[in-house]
């Protein structure tokens, strides 16, 4: 019934297998990929007809993790997998980015790629396996895919690179890097580090590339045995369109791309586009899409030639020049920390809000439930590029936010030193390239403005590349048009000492490690320059948090005292909250976190906790409250939880006939500790008064 094809290989001591022919046989390509007990089903289907109204390649990648894969039932009221989580969206992008450039530009059929986690062992992470499975599904589908691609994760533990580390190994790693590409070239890099040098990062990319070449060879062997017939892709002859556009619009486009202002340049190009369409309006052989495609090719030729031959960029800068930078902090009066970062025509208002552990984000995944202390949200409204459009969070916003998150994360202080929860929001108010890196710079400034003791300021820069044959130019701080018309988008963020985050997307094959080395070197120079400009606004964190920030402090109590702090049925902790106005959180290790609206509230709560957990000291005088009257003396509560006996002979210097002659229940009194008897405290009011 089934004609099954299967290939296996061992990579980094783990067996990876690819199988096809048994499941999802009506898809154009279907692969069951497994590593350990983690299993991915990747399917791909392409529309058999081209949509004539499509002027782009409609590839959709939807990665999904099924809860049953880890033996779980989804939480919440509806027991079904809901909309994609942030993690699923990020992995979908991770799969899409190395695959998309490997389809020919004339291929416009709709393609849907669905990698699904159907078994998960909590040790072998599914994202790398999902890229492998997706690549294999495309390789056997017959579609015009110029792959296959492979992928690796690289860790760094004790100075040694680890290929495809387990989840446990990754927890001890100073590097989490994902690299994907073909046998000959790297196409995508995504990483988070603790601040590593350019040399270490480049070697990690090389190590990862070498690691996935055997996987690509396995996919190629599988495809030789079971690849479906190749799809035919019609390539329309547009030489006549190209010729007429060059004759009529080369001069106009050259002038347009010499215009520095983005909006003016965009308006000029739009007018040229309208004229170009009008030129072919009566020719039924060519659609507006055909004209648009060739006009874009002409734009690309003009800009790229100017950069390669004349070393001249669109806005007149040199190849390594960074646009003018303006930084301001404290721009919003009621926020905890804020910054306005402007670099050329790219601008971000970035705001830091500090909260308590109650504000941590609760996440559910195949690994279980966990809490996230640091959140960074990136918003890209259409007005930032002078357009109208949809408002909301898409994959692009999620991806840019996570990139900035990775850049900042390693510089944040640990919870033990600074017990706040962080939420950073980057509002992009203008955009002409590199808005995610503007978010990194603004986030660093906003954190320092909020009084967060970050380890080092962080800055980011986006690099570009123009390459024709062996001739290439690396561009620093690219514009939107340079990104669109160039061959590489290479974002690097870090401190003055090292890289904290790196993201690279390459649109062509043949990018050498020499080019990557040049880009990293140039990026470091740009990053140091940007940090210098940021330091002019604020060079270090403010000494304390702002006026409107919750005042937080932590105190560690003996585990034996946790019950005393909480009290019977929570009575004591409720009393502290009522009297101080602060919020309290007590964990199992005895760490008590106090969050208060102001200093006075925090001080009251802290003093009450100290009183409750303090130990009685011999000969020390305390304030107390008479709790019970007996014939032989009075029991007094002091230090919040401690009881002691004042014997009738220790009530006063004179002889006392009745205890009630001196005190009654509820009286506030001063007492001195005069001894201990089998764990009981002996007190004296008489000696306290002397």
Swiss-Prot record:
Entry GO CC: cytosol
The keyword Transmembrane helix appears for this protein: no
Catalytic activity, reaction form: RNA(n+1) + phosphate = RNA(n) + a ribonucleoside 5'-diphosphate
EC assignment: 2.7.7.8
Annotated residues for binding of Mg(2+): 483, 489
GO biological process, one term: RNA processing
Cofactor(s) it depends on: Mg(2+)
Superkingdom, taxonomy of origin: Bacteria
InterPro entries, sorted: ExoRNase_PH_dom1, ExoRNase_PH_dom2, ExoRNase_PH_dom2_sf, KH_dom, KH_dom_type_1, KH_dom_type_1_sf, NA-bd_OB-fold, PNPase
Keyword Nucleotidyltransferase applies: yes
Domain KH: 550-609
Compartments where found: Cytoplasm
Function: Involved in mRNA degradation. Catalyzes the phosphorolysis of single-stranded polyribonucleotides processively in the 3'- to 5'-direction.
Sequence similarity: Belongs to the polyribonucleotide nucleotidyltransferase family.
Alphabetical list of HAMAP family matching this protein: PNPase
Protein's UniProt name: Polyribonucleotide nucleotidyltransferase
Gene that this polypeptide is encoded by: pnp
């Amino acid at each position: 019934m089934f004609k099954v094809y299967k290939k296996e290989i061992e990579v980094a001591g783990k067996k990876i297998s690819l199988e096809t022919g048994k499941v999802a046989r009506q898809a154009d390509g279907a692969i069951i990929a497994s590593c350990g007990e983690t299993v991915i089903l990747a399917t791909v289907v392409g529309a058999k007809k081209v949509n004539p109204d499509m002027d782009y390649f409609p590839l959709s990648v939807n990665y999904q993790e099924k809860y049953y894969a880890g033996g779980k039932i989804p939480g919440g009221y509806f027991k079904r997998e809901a909309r994609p989580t942030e993690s699923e969206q990020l992995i979908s992008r991770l799969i899409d980015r190395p695959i998309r450039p490997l389809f020919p530009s004339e291929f416009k059929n709709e393609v849907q790629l669905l990698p699904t986690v159907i078994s998960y062992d909590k040790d072998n992470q599914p994202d790398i396996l999902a890229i492998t499975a997706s690549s294999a599904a495309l390789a056997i589908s017959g579609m015009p895919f110029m792959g296959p691609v492979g992928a690796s994760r690289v860790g760094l533990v004790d100075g040694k690179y680890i290929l495809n580390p387990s989840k446990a190994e990754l927890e001890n790693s100073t590097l989490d890097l994902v690299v994907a590409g073909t046998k000959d070239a790297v196409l995508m890099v995504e990483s988070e580090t603790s601040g590593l040098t350019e040399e270490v990062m480049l070697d990690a990319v090389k190590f990862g590339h070498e690691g996935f070449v055997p996987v690509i060879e396995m996919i190629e062997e599988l495809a030789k045995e079971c690849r479906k017939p190749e799809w035919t892709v019609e390539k329309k002859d547009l030489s006549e369109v190209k010729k007429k556009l060059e004759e009529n619009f080369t001069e106009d486009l050259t002038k347009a791309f010499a215009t520095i202002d983005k909006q003016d340049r965009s308006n000029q190009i739009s007018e040229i586009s309208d004229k170009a369409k009008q030129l072919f309006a009566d020719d039924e052989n060519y659609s507006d899409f055909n004209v648009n495609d060739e006009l874009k090719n002409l734009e690309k030729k003009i800009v790229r030639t100017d950069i390669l031959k004349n070393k001249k960029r669109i806005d007149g800068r040199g190849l390594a020049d960074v646009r003018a930078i303006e930084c301001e902090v404290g721009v919003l009066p009621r926020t905890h920390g804020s910054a306005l970062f402007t670099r050329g025509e790219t601008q971000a208002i970035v705001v830091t809000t500090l909260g308590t552990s109650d504000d941590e984000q609760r996440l559910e995944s195949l690994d279980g439930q966990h809490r996230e202390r640091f959140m960074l949200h990136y918003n890209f409204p259409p007005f930032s590029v002078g357009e109208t459009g949809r408002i909301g969070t898409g994959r692009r916003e999620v991806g840019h936010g996570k990139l900035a998150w990775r850049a900042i994360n390693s510089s944040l202080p640990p919870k033990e030193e600074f017990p706040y929860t962080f939420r950073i929001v980057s509002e992009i108010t203008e955009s002409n390239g590199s808005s995610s890196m503007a978010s990194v710079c603004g986030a660093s400034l906003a954190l320092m403005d909020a009084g967060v003791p970050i380890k080092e300021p962080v800055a980011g820069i986006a690099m570009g590349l123009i390459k024709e044959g062996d001739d290439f130019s690396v561009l620093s701080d690219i514009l939107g048009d340079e990104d669109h018309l160039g061959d590489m988008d290479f974002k690097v963020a870090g401190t003055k000492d090292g890289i904290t985050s790196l993201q690279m997307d390459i649109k062509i094959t043949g990018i050498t490690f020499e080019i990557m080395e040049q880009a990293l070197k140039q990026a470091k120079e740009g990053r140091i320059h940007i940090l210098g400009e940021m330091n002019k606004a604020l060079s270090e964190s403010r000494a304390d948090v702002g006026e409107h920030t919750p005042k937080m402090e932590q105190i560690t109590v003996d585990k034996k005292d946790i019950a005393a702090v909480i009290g019977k049925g929570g009575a004591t902790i409720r009393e502290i909250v009522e009297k101080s106005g602060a919020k309290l959180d007590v964990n199992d290790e005895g760490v008590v976190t106090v969050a208060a609206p102001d200093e006075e509230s925090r001080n009251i709560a802290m003093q009450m906790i100290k009183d409750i957990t303090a130990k009685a000291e011999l000969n020390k005088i305390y304030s107390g409250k008479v709790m019970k009257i007996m014939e032989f003396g009075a029991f007094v509560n002091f230090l919040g939880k401690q009881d002691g006996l004042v014997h009738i002979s220790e009530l006063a210097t004179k002889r006392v006939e009745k205890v009630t002659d001196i005190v009654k229940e509820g009286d506030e009194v001063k007492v001195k500790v005069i001894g201990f008897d089998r764990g009981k405290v002996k007190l004296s009011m008489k000696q306290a008064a002397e």
